[in-house]
Amino acid sequence: MAKDLVIVESPAKARTVQRFLGDDFVALASMGHVRDLPKGKMGIELDDRTFKPTYDVMDDKKKIIAELSKASKEAETVYLATDPDREGEAISWHLLAAAKIPARKVKRVVFHEITNTAISEAFANPRDLDRDLIDAQQARRVLDRLVGYRLSPVLWGKVRRGLSAGRVQSVALRLVVDREAEIAAFVPREYWSIESNFSKRPQNGQEGVFEASIHAIKGVKGRISMPDETRTREILTDLTDATYKVDSVRKRQRHSRPAAPFITSTMQQEAYRKLRFTARRTMVVAQQLYEGLNVGDEGSVGLITYMRTDSTNVAGQALAEAASYIKSKFGADYAPDKPRFYSKKVKGAQEAHEAIRPTSILREPDKIRSFLNNEQFRLYDLIWKRLVASQMKDALFDSTSVSIGAAGCKSGTEYEFRASGSVMTFRGFRALYLEDIDAGSEPVSEGSQDLPHLAEGEGLDCLKLDPGQHFTQPPPRFTEASLVKALEEQGIGRPSTYAPTLATLMNRDYVRKDRGMFAPSKLGAAVTGLLTQHFPDIMDVSFTAKVEGELDEIAGGARKWTPMLQEFYSPFDESVKRALKEAERVPRDQIDEETDEICEQCGKPMVIKSGRFGRFLSCSGFPDCKQSQPLLQRVGVECPECGSDLVERQARKATKGRNKRFYGCSNYPTCTFAVNQRPLPQPCPECSKMLVAMGRSNSRCAACGFKGPIPESETLDVAV
């Protein structure tokens, strides 16, 4: 009897699915995307405005397609079990065409977690391929190819060869460039404060001492203004003989609510803040947790639900499991009477998806720690705690706000000081988890000082008045967390695009990281300026969000993809032709990037220039000084030991039988990691560690020994 064939994307997912399905099925992996638009040409029919794409099977997937085609002929039924989103639907469609699988044999199965229950339910309820989802993904791919292929030549002619533009990446770059312009234009404003220490009477050491700050002039609306030291000294002099008493005491109970379960963007943000994982690293590790890991007696099982989602929905079974766990672990007081639900705030969130959660609450992080590597454990621990905390009761605080009057001043003016204090009376979800905040964000003050018992009309002693000078601060640069948050809030891209977009900006040298924050390079600023001037629609945040909305409509069957592209392309085509004719070339000195390196010949700074053989370091004193040297080229891969960029280096002497070129950490000598073979951006499909190139077409993983063809780039959602 022929076995049914199940096709998934990766070997790890295939192993986990195979274990649950048993011997009547054979699960094989496509190793990701198998077809794409051709390299080196547009691959889209423009003459008749049908935008019909031409797809080629990727070179490194031809052998895999042949194997899948053979296996499909031997199978009675072929189940396409790729990921449960538009990209997964498109992969299934491409597999059907590339492997020439008869449609009558094919069934589509969808699951959001790789567990026995979820897989059994999916295979009991197969469906046909969803043409609307396929069309939405195809429209995205075609649109991004149109934008990338038409804009990039404009940059080559007006800025520098080898540059790229894209519908999502260019708008993300604009956010970084605009923020830098805000910072540069910011003018700090001086302001002053007066902090004070008060004591109950009679004084008894530090007992009954608390802090307050001047707030207002009685009878005058708004906060008191102290723009400079002169005004502040006037107030201090006025307060010399003042007497103080409690005007009012206001007490209330305050609630602190838990954060919603993770969606893709919030997981990337929190993993950066708490774990210092890049968005890309977070998604690699989350993929491992989703596809399945061996956890002892359970065998291989998916530990979390699908990690590309913008929905905060949680399945009823998981909610019930969380409530039961909370009651048994923390007590009934910590579990609400009914499940907590969180409203969707992301534009176009796909409600069929779930939030990112553990597939079993009972699989506590510490119980499976020995089966996970450090990165896997830390991310799983974060996801598990976030979900459980989201189903716990609020933390409760007794908050007190005290108004203190200052009378008897020399000018007759009466001032108001304010003090606040807060005491946690019930930990609630904080017994397990507390969300971090972005760098540069205003911290949420809990007013944590413990105020003494105070009564209205009670006299107080002022122990000291401390003036303080302050200056307003510019908006902070974006971190990975805050940039992902901005992309999400403004509807730029989708969960699958956040990580590759950030990686593209770095790899193209459009931005650099300065103490963990994104700063645009001169090149990035020049590219943004040119594109914003000549392609205002493409660079408009609202336009990008509108496109995402239209893609959502296509996915929902409310719109056809060809008319959407026709509406976009004609004005875009005119803008490209006009820019090629009218745009001025960007002067070289506006894109030459300054460096910290000093010229060995004359002592002037070295700058990064571009020549016919690529980028290099040149003395800024050229042509008086002609000193130049090779530039360390980033290879687009993070150092596995410290997370810095890996760069290409040259050894001073070549060892016999070895090339002088090797690849080392840019953080040398602090980090000494190095390899002789070129690191590849795609992780090992077996263990997700680093792959290196072996010759022109093969790859190898030093960690697990995997060998296979070099994977082709699969960042299909972001135009390059």
Task: State each model region's role.
Residues 220-260, 458:
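Metal- or metallocofactor-binding catalytic centers and their adjacent structured scaffolds
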Residues 1-141, 150, 215-216, 223-233, ...:
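Intrinsically disordered, low-complexity regulatory segments
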Residues 158-162, 177-228, 274:
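C-terminal helical "lid" subdomain and adjoining coupling/linker elements of P-loop NTPases
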Residues 139-151, 168, 198-200, 254-266, ...:
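Core structural elements
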Residues 246-249, 257-271, 298-306, 474-486:
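Short acidic, hydrophobic short linear motifs in intrinsically disordered regions
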Residues 114-196:
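C-terminal or mid-to-C-terminal helical accessory/interaction module adjacent to the motor/catalytic core
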Residues 2, 83-84, 160-164, 251-260, ...:
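Conserved short loop/turn motifs at secondary-structure junctions
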Residues 2-5, 16, 23, 98, ...:
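Basic, low-complexity terminal or inter-domain segments flanking catalytic cores
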